[in-house]
Amino acid sequence: MVVVLIISMLFMAAVPAYQRVQRKARASAIANDFRVFSAVFQAKAHETGAWPAEASAGVVPAGITTQEIKTDIWSHASPMGGKFDWDNNQVHPGGTSPGGRWRAALAINSTADAPLLLDYALMTEIDRALDDGNLTTGSFRLGFGDCPLYILEP
């Protein structure tokens, strides 16, 4: 009986630590994906003089090739659910362009086959890795429907 009690207490102490490690790993993976994808889109805009056209979540925008971006990561569910989405001149909270739009941004949005899990602790962890740790300011923030949004050009 005492052995069971000790094991259960150790398990109770280990679970939160394991969850923190999992959250940190997910946040690091997503932050890295945002960095890599933003570099691709910024390079494309520099080469062509314009941002790529708007595309749906999980769909690689026209003009972006498989040599430039890992399409399997873009088109499959992210570690927090949802799929990556290129937002060109789309409306999101706090948008600074006319009509409350952001000129260029990367988001993760829900799709029918990949629902987005709204984990604010995870998004705050991503914000700490990419920006200022505040989901209402800076280049990483909550977008429309509280989706994670990484702003490339206001």
Model-derived regions, located:
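Short, exposed beta-strand-loop hairpins at the edges of beta-sheets
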Residues: 132, 136-143
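Short, low-complexity, Pro/Ser/Thr/Gly-rich segments in the mature regions of secreted, periplasmic
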Residues: 141-154
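Extracellular/periplasmic head regions of type IV pilus-like filament subunits
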Residues: 42, 46-126, 151-153
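N-terminal single-pass transmembrane signal-anchor helix
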Residues: 1-23
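Membrane-proximal N-terminal amphipathic helix
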Residues: 23-50
